[in-house]
């Protein structure tokens, strides 16, 4: 066991995590030269295109060190984005060490810090590495200062490398072997294996990626999940080198996969502990929690007959993404669809993109909302994730909204504009620290404000230099109201929004004005109103299209003209009673684009 090293790589987006992983796999000879491709471990198309890692992957590699010994290195690739922070913490708790990759030209950024703190809390040895030192803009001294300043770990002897050219990659591996401790654990003890990730394979069912902490696992053993109590016979065990390779057994300290003929992904939850049925472990490994969705949105098919296809697509996606939740819902305006829960905005975009790309769906998405805690006047508490389910104002005692703690990092030139943005978003400043040229701001901001367009606005006010990460803090009482949109006196449920009272009038006016531009003119007047409860806060009118009925009427008596006009008026009135206004798809997106002034 002294020759095993389990490690993962922590980095901000675009600091070269996947490229470094590619190089390490190449140096260790994990794949032949013809099988190498960029970002070997990112298996989804979206991961490649966006250059992000979503699911954790592993590679078991053997490396002959300069001291002549052969070491088994287990690389566990982690996602770097805040939406997937639970997956990151599970991947990290399976390691003894982590390579902290920092772009020498950019310095430390928000997600690096967030994941690095997670690693330090879990007691993982962090080994700093400066990447991209071949760039003319690289400034390694500055980056080292920032690492020591912001994160507070000693980085004087940080290894320097360039993952693109392969320069210094072996030094990184040597530093890893020297600094990271070998795994502890007893191969003879009762089995405890941590599920790092799980995904669905069309041929063998669910594949679980595990780190064996104690004990030994062989095919034909009976295992059980400690969170659910379900039992399964093991069919295969093995490792990925990144290709899968079956082994006779997996024992303490190793990272590999288990295939046990499990049919649904919900049975193999990330963070759960696997143990033997015959000789079970007394307690599960710490840190398991159910992941709760933070952001909700309605997904509807554009064609009503696509509903079943959408349901099948969601079921298939759910096989590979246990954190996605959905339930059927009906909207008067959009017909049948699903209310889906996501971990965050990036997660939502990815699910939408995968539905459109892999399953060829045409979707309408409603505005994303967060979950509110509503205390009703009879004392009961309900969770509202859909504006349409918000009780009437008279039945609400108080509404609590989710507050998140946001950490922002930016060069000091942009502090002013970022603070202004946070203030607009009803944020309250908790802390502000200067680290050399970088500034760290900590704010508490309502999650609802972040969901809309905070990230895009942050990037635009800071010219792309600011980076952020956020985590849920608590529910806090707040004065939020539901704004309904009425078209000719009828509520359109899919257009309801929940906003803070201070912005409700303004948002109502803006949405009404937007709708006026978007809804085509009808044969009769259309009134668009925004209402809070029974109180109308804004109104816009769309004038009717009308035919000039007097065109053929020359001279003669005025009563002749009056008669024609009256007749037209009657017709319009009748039309208005039976007609319904078609609301185009853009109207639902318009709500998203209403800027907060």
From Swiss-Prot:
Residues 2-184 form the tr-type G domain. The keyword Membrane applies. Keywords: Cell inner membrane, Cell membrane, GTP-binding, Hydrolase, Membrane, Nucleotide-binding, Protein biosynthesis. GO terms for molecular function: GTP binding; GTPase activity; guanosine tetraphosphate binding; ribosome binding; translation elongation factor activity. It is a peripheral membrane protein. GO terms for cellular component: plasma membrane. It catalyses: GTP + H2O = GDP + phosphate + H(+). Its EC number is 3.6.5.n1. GTP binds at residues 14-19, 131-134. It is an enzyme of class 3 (hydrolase). It is found in: Cell inner membrane. One of its GO terms (biological process) is positive regulation of translation. InterPro entries: EF-4, EFG_III/V, EFG_V-like, EFTu-like_2, G_TR_CS, LepA_C_sf, LepA_CTD, LepA_IV. NCBIfam families: lepA, small_GTP. Required for accurate and efficient protein synthesis under certain stress conditions. May act as a fidelity factor of the translation reaction, by catalyzing a one-codon backward translocation of tRNAs on improperly translocated ribosomes. Back-translocation proceeds from a post-translocation (POST) complex to a pre-translocation (PRE) complex, thus giving elongation factor G a second chance to translocate the tRNAs correctly. Binds to ribosomes in a GTP-dependent manner. This is Elongation factor 4.
